[in-house]
Amino acid sequence: MKKATQSKAWTTVQIARHPERPQFLDYVGEIFTEFDALHGDRLFGDDGAMVGGLARFDGQPVMVIGQHRGRSTREKLKHNFGMCNPEGYRKSQRLLDMAERFNLPVFTFIDTMGAYPGVGAEERGQAEAIATSLAQLSSLKVPVIATVLGEGGSGGALGIGVADRVIMLSHSIYSVISPEGCASILWKTAEKAAQASEALGLTADKLQSLGIVEYVVDEGEGAHLDPERVMQNLKVVLKQALDELLPMDANERCEARYQRLMKFGSENLGMAS
């Protein structure tokens, strides 16, 4: 039984990384209309890994922000393989400010191995940029809905992952570290990545059982096999989540978001909330 569970977790990792898996801009084109991308952080530059802008969702103006990886070599380089630099997170902060100013609900979409670990990124304040994003999202007065599309890797994912509702596709993953990285630390070899994937509890079902994720969107054997159906399934869940949040008072919504974060781990660790 244990081996079967490990195999299932590792299979999920492989599907989440499938090269034909739909990416952020694919979902934007199917779920939203009138998308108008905005560029730059007004401090250093524009980060192709973080894409965001104004759009309409069922006719309603919204702000859409997400990580895009790219498929061709040229596109992957343009989008830095979905690994954001500090200017990417600062661009998202600028868009979040705009969303709050104009009372626009925010949809974020996560698909990254992690934040870019380069020297330049560290020199420009990668940790500060992510921390500021976490603080900003925690207190934003408008509804925030986050969706994990593929890989949700560590702080790179959390930088746009604090939300009122979190959604995962059924073959997406969300983890503090990659299975290979975990295996290299614990067992000094990446060959035990399958075992690490089970230990990390990175699957959508597991995270939903822990209360970290509210919704899991069924994608059958993988979103790459029937992308249009999966996108429509996700659109239905996004609408449901937004309909739950819009009637709430802004202060009530912020307090509920705070309490959602504070309860993580309390039940499983036997701690008081």
Curated annotation (Swiss-Prot):
Keywords: ATP-binding, Cytoplasm, Fatty acid biosynthesis, Fatty acid metabolism, Lipid biosynthesis, Lipid metabolism, Nucleotide-binding, Transferase. It is found in: Cytoplasm. Pathway: Lipid metabolism; malonyl-CoA biosynthesis; malonyl-CoA from acetyl-CoA: step 1/1. It catalyses: N(6)-carboxybiotinyl-L-lysyl-[protein] + acetyl-CoA = N(6)-biotinyl-L-lysyl-[protein] + malonyl-CoA. It comes from the Bacteria. One of its GO terms (cellular component) is acetyl-CoA carboxylase complex. One of its GO terms (biological process) is fatty acid biosynthetic process. PROSITE patterns: COA_CT_CTER. Its EC number is 2.1.3.15. One of its GO terms (molecular function) is ATP binding. It is an enzyme of class 2 (transferase). Residues 1-244 form the CoA carboxyltransferase C-terminal domain. Its main location: cytoplasm. Acetyl-CoA carboxylase is a heterohexamer composed of biotin carboxyl carrier protein (AccB), biotin carboxylase (AccC) and two subunits each of ACCase subunit alpha (AccA) and ACCase subunit beta (AccD). Component of the acetyl coenzyme A carboxylase (ACC) complex. First, biotin carboxylase catalyzes the carboxylation of biotin on its carrier protein (BCCP) and then the CO(2) group is transferred by the carboxyltransferase to acetyl-CoA to form malonyl-CoA. Belongs to the AccA family. NCBIfam families: accA, AccA_sub, PRK05724.1. This is Acetyl-coenzyme A carboxylase carboxyl transferase subunit alpha. It comes from Acinetobacter baumannii (strain ATCC 17978 / DSM 105126 / CIP 53.77 / LMG 1025 / NCDC KC755 / 5377).
